[in-house]
């Protein structure tokens, strides 16, 4: 069983670029059809570690869906980000839905 370091609804930072993001899904290993760089195909430990669907914002504040390896992400220490309130709202909304899911008939 593969354990992931981060959970759905958690805010994270990209280690290299420092971008704030919110995890919206987790894959136990790389699951896209083709690796977007040759290193992923060659480095089995990177490919078989958890990968995350992360929503970030571009320079204009528009949401961007990214697919990142666990090694590319770090913990975010702060819960509030005045410069990116929509990501705070997204994270809170996801966490609330996970705590109290709506039942469908």
Curated annotation (Swiss-Prot):
GO cellular component labels: cytoplasm
UniProt family annotation: Belongs to the HspQ family.
Domain of life: Bacteria
Gene Ontology biological-process entries: response to heat
Compartment(s) where it occurs, according to its Swiss-Prot or TrEMBL record: Cytoplasm
Record organism: Baumannia cicadellinicola subsp. Homalodisca coagulata
Function noted in UniProt: Involved in the degradation of certain denaturated proteins, including DnaA, during heat shock stress.
Primary location: cytoplasm
Coiled coil among keywords: no
Protein name stated in the entry: Heat shock protein HspQ
NCBIfam families listed in its UniProt record: PRK14129.1, yccV
């Amino acid at each position: 069983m593969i354990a992931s370091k981060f959970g759905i609804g958690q805010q994270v930072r990209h280690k290299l670029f420092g971008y704030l993001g919110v995890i919206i899904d987790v894959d136990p290993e790389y699951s896209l059809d083709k690796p977007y760089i040759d290193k992923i195909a060659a480095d089995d430990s990177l490919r078989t570690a958890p990968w995350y669907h992360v929503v970030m914002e571009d320079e204009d504040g528009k949401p961007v869906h990214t697919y990142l390896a666990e090694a590319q992400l770090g913990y975010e220490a702060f819960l509030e980000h005045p410069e990116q309130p929509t990501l705070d709202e997204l994270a809170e909304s996801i966490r609330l839905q996970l705590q109290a899911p709506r039942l469908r008939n």
